[in-house]
Amino acid sequence: DNVLTSYSFLAALSENETDIYKTVYLPLFKRAISSYAAKKSSKESNSIQGTDIDIQSIILEEYGIEVPILIVRKLIKAVGTSLSKKERNIFKFDTFEDGKAFQFTNYNYFSTEEIYDRERRNAQALQQAFEDYLKSENLSEKNIPSFSQFIDKNKCNLSSFFSGKNCLIHDVEGSFMAHVNFLQHIEGGYHYLYQTAERIYLGSVIASFLETGVDLESKIDDNIIYYLDTQIVLEALDLQKAEDTLPTQELLKLIRATGGKIRLLDITINEIHKIIELAINNYSKSHPTTTVNEACVRIGKNKTWLISINGKLESFIKAELQVDIDGILETKMNLYSRSEDVNLLKQTRIHKSTAIHDVAAYLHVRDRREGNIRLFQKAKYWFVTANKKLADFNISRKTNGFVNETIMPEELTSLLFLKNPQKLAKKVSQIGLNELIAQTLSEEYASKELINEIDIAIKESADLSAEDYNILFSSIALQSTNKIQKLLEEISDKRKFNESIHNLIEKERTKQAKSKEEKIQRQKQFEEVNHEKLSLE
């Protein structure tokens, strides 16, 4: 698979290096121009001509990376200036119109072929292992997205963030659970394959930098302040899903290791208090009703423990996570609460009060920055959230050309990689792949809170019989987080919402009827076989 090979190749080039531009981008373009030269015949002419579009197409075709044309021109020029005097005399390499065009009599570049061939073998071994795993689990490849699509989803998300736009990321038909299960399978007994997966993940991060033209020369300062959103705090405390705990805790370590400061806002403490209070009021050991409740059962904590920590929540969190708390002035909160952003975000929320918290948090960051920032590395304050819809909303409400205030864990991990690529490559690839696994699980399995939200919405907006309600929830229990969220987005259009609900009911009814019929047929066949055996006896 070209994409897997490409990402593994990029990561291998960056290994033990500090300058990604010189050690990754430049060799990539030298190899692309060499490939272009090999495809062109110089028999009819003494020289070969090409354009920026030609090299852009080669990079996309051979590596699956869409490099902006201005970056292509810059790197074409860089290839020319990187040549020694002897090479310039041999190749007669010239560029024109600031990198728009080039010509040479001959050009070849073989310095990285050994690395490329090795990474191609590694990528092919991983792909083959994935295909073998699907067969062992009796899963059809036709119904499962490719492994490159799983990794590419991460690159697309990162490219969206670094471009500062809500880029359209095409939904892939099928679940990515097989990919997560495969990674968990090889992590224990097939360490070499898992290392390849980590390397490919890191390559996808580097590809996102190249696709969006991230300024690699700009360095990240120390003492940057990171405010944590509610869910991030709960994950760090191991009070959310089990798979979210380690990646979040590792991210906090990475922030500190790169000179960052972790803080919470007082409004976030208040929001966490309400969430824990809800878990206390509805606590059940046998049938957990909230994610916090579910986590307590998993880690062996009871209702009394929850009551205890909620009574001293601020001091508990400060001690557990070693963080400071910042307050927002009442006058500022009043100002933030009246912003247009709050009203717009409320329209997308079941729980309207959460919109005030989220908008106030990123507007506080905006104020603390004291002006618009154009480079990600120069932002002194961030609001770290796991809420993709909030992150997208923030991007839509920022000033074009400037950096948004929210950042998701996988985006922050990738950004921190630029602090010291040589030192942080292994750690970032480990944390990042774990974050991708956790994010995939979150997208596949709806939280207790999301199930409760859709339940409330159905009861308020749809008139269903008891039978239809039970059939509907048999279906919803199997739906992914993304599908349930899309259903919730239709609440404002009652007709469309009800239409979608009844479509789910009919599909589930048909599915159950088919299952029942198949069961009857199997029972009938079983009885016929038994009857034949008795007749023979």
Regions picked out by a protein language model, each given a short descriptive name:
Residues 1-41, 52, 58-66, 70-381, ...:
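Active-site-proximal, substrate-binding regions of enzyme catalytic domains
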Residues 43-49:
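Short helix-capping/hinge SLiMs at alpha-helix to coil transitions
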